[in-house]
Amino acid sequence: MLLETSYLGMRLPHPFIAGASPFGYHLDTVKRLEDAGWAAVVLHSLFEEQVSMVREGRIAHMNPDDQRFAEMIEYFPKQSDFRYGPHEYAEHLYRVTRAVKIPVIGSLNGHTRESWLTFAPLIEQAGAAALEVNWYEVNTDARASAAYAEEELVEMVRDIKGLVKIPLAVKLSPFFTAFANVASQVDEAGADALVLFNRFYQPEIDVTTMQVVPRLHLSTNAELPLRLRWAAILCGRVNASLAITGGVATPHDGIKAILVGADAVQMVSAVLNHGPSYVTVMRTSLEQWLDWHNMASIAEARGRLSHRTTENPAAYERANYIRTLHSWGVPAA
């Protein structure tokens, strides 16, 4: 049974990738991911804010009340464990890439041109097989237009591609007015992969203390449908690889991602809940499902239910919204 896939120009033995998580903090835990059989690993992110803290002489530690730390806030490390700055991150990345054989993807989380363009080359020089950049920006300025935010993102992607030679994945937010258009622009700017989606955390209000506080939860497959919809819509319409991250909790979730067109499936919460060996469950279940449907490889399944190929493309559009609403009813008195 062929589970081999291509992602970011790399041939992987199967589509399951360990996403950015605390397993990336230490060399021995990355080795555990490799030994368990993950196809690749995304290292934990280097955050723009922690770099600026170092430069300003303040302690480089993430503030758990700062909602900008969208990706890793729930895995808040102890101060003694935190990677303080770009050079320490690069040194750790260098050691990891020399110690394991699976591809190691560096990760950069920022929102300004300076941070992306300054630190992307460092990650490449450290030996990363690819770079994943995470775009996170909350535009609170009512004078800033949607077009301006989109142009800023696209220009930064284009600039990074001009600086580094390793493949570039862009982890996007779903909160764009016309997401398909933005994804197409990022694709045309040179992104080698689109990762759907960055997981944002919303502020919570503590009515006792009257403060804004974080509420941190691991993702569940309730978050998956949004990712499935947009992967299905983009499949066959962009040249970039597609990866789904967030909401893949079970083998069936991974199969769904492949059916809508995902080339790779990133998993974090499931690894934290079940341990690195859970990848064996994912692989075995995928093999059994392919065999049950008389498919020799995942290539036969990938994109079978994409927007372009499905017999019912309206399922990804407004028609499904109406149908879903009418699927519920209340018995007559």
Language model: regions and residue ranges:
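N-terminal amphipathic alpha-helix/helix-capping segment at the start of soluble metabolic enzymes
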Residues: 1-17, 88-97
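N-terminal binding-site loop/beta-alpha segment at the start of enzyme catalytic domains
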Residues: 7-8, 14-32
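Short, basic, glycine/proline-bearing loop/turn elements
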Residues: 10-17, 75-79, 167-169
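Short strand->helix junction
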Residues: 23, 113, 271-272
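Alpha/beta enzyme core
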Residues: 27-67, 84-105, 109-244, 249-265, ...
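Short glycine/proline- and acidic residue-enriched helix-loop micro-motifs
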Residues: 71-80, 217
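A compact, surface-exposed functional segment
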Residues: 255-287
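C-terminal extensions of enzymes
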Residues: 274-294, 298-333
